[in-house]
Design a protein with these regions (language model features):
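Glycine/tryptophan-enriched, flexible segments
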Residues: 8, 156-347
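Trp/Phe/Arg-rich N-terminal binding region typifying the photolyase-homology
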Residues: 1-188
């Protein structure tokens, strides 16, 4: 575009996957900065549904219902910022190349994932787009630590948690990236329609099964998908932690825990936030930052300096990092340090 004096890309696609949020989303922010227009896209891949070779649902109705809510909330957030979410049902390597042709996109911005199937999908998409002259730019945003900040190459990563934890104990956590207040509009070329979010039935699932979730779920609360709900949960979570720490400290000292709440270290308490982390509605760095602000209150809740809620949180997030990095290590021939570019502009907290 000769009139594009700023040297911006004419159009870019942002491929959302397990990063269904606008806060701390480097792929979205980078595309918005680099491009004159952006096309946010989410693909429901039919290969993620149906039955596995063992006869089990690849994606059950409860998880699918939660995912649909996450996608709907992401669409609402993007619309509030002047954009939209293009939704398609089909193989990403087909859907994305067709959209790129329609809008004349020159770049695809995407966060990398860790499993073998997810990486296969990345490679297929990258290959077909390369044939069309579209550059794929990879980012990383699913862990507490960025892989570029680790004190080892991924192929040299310790295979046990103890060794991993020892090596990363002095690694800083990068600051979260603020959610953009305004986004570039959709490309005018191509007249791409947003598309409808599919129903459970259209995904091949039984909707009556998922509706049973309207009764009681684990912990006695309904799980509602989406970034908005995730941030509300995080706020409540931060308020609950000091009380949980105090009760746990009393229990450890032999006193009876007051209030009869869930144990801080129990599965019930942990799962109050993990579903949103799994879908990427909540960034682990955002969770860490928000609870770090409550550090003084957490320490005041217990006299044991090495046993407060923040330390517990870091312990849980470190386990999550370990499993994601170890999965990446053994599920791909590509080295993560080669595939993910460093981002010098992001400082550490």
């Amino acid at each position: 575009n000769p009139g594009n004096a700023a040297g911006l890309r004419q159009a870019s696609i942002v491929w959302f996957r397990n990063d269904l949020r606008v806060h701390d989303n480097e792929a979205l922010v980078s595309a918005n900065r680099d491009s004159s227009s952006i096309l946010p896209v989410y693909c429901f891949d039919p290969r993620d549904y149906g039955k596995s070779s063992s006869g089990f649902d690849k994606t059950g109705p409860y998880r699918a219902k939660f995912l649909l809510e996450c996608v709907a909330n992401l669409r609402a957030s993007l619309r509030e910022r002047g954009s939209d979410l293009i939704v398609r049902v089909g193989n990403p390597e087909d859907m994305l190349v067709n959209l790129a042709k329609s809008v004349g996109a020159s770049g695809l911005y995407v966060h990398q994932e860790v499993t073998h199937e997810e990486q296969e999908s990345e490679e297929k998409v990258s290959a077909v787009l390369k044939d069309e002259g579209v550059e794929t730019k990879y980012f990383w945003g699913s862990t507490l630590f960025h892989p570029d900040d680790l004190p080892f190459k991924l192929h040299e990563m310790p295979s046990n948690y103890g060794g991993f934890r020892e090596k990363v104990q002095n690694v800083h956590v990068r600051k979260t990236i603020e959610a953009p207040r305004q986004l570039k509009g959709l490309p005018q070329q191509g007249g791409v329609k947003p598309g409808d979010i599919p129903s459970l039935q259209e995904l091949g699932l039984n909707p009556t099964t998922a509706l049973r979730q309207d009764s009681q779920t684990a912990g006695g609360a309904m799980l509602v998908g989406g970034e908005g709900e995730a941030l509300k949960r995080l706020q409540r979570f931060a308020l609950e932690v000091p009380g949980q720490v105090a009760n746990q400290a009393k229990a450890f000292s032999g006193s009876k825990s007051e209030g009869g709440g869930d144990s801080l270290y129990g599965a019930n308490f942990s799962c109050k936030i993990s579903p949103w982390l799994a879908m990427g509605c909540l960034s682990p760095r955002r969770m860490f930052e928000d609870l770090k602000k409550d550090g003084p209150r957490l320490k005041a809740a217990t006299t044991a300096n090495d046993d407060n809620g923040l330390n517990w949180l870091v312990f849980e997030l470190l386990w999550r990092d370990f499993f994601r990095f170890i999965t990446k290590k053994y599920s791909s021939g590509k080295k993560i340090h080669e595939a993910v570019p460093a981002t010098a502009s992001l400082a550490a907290v």
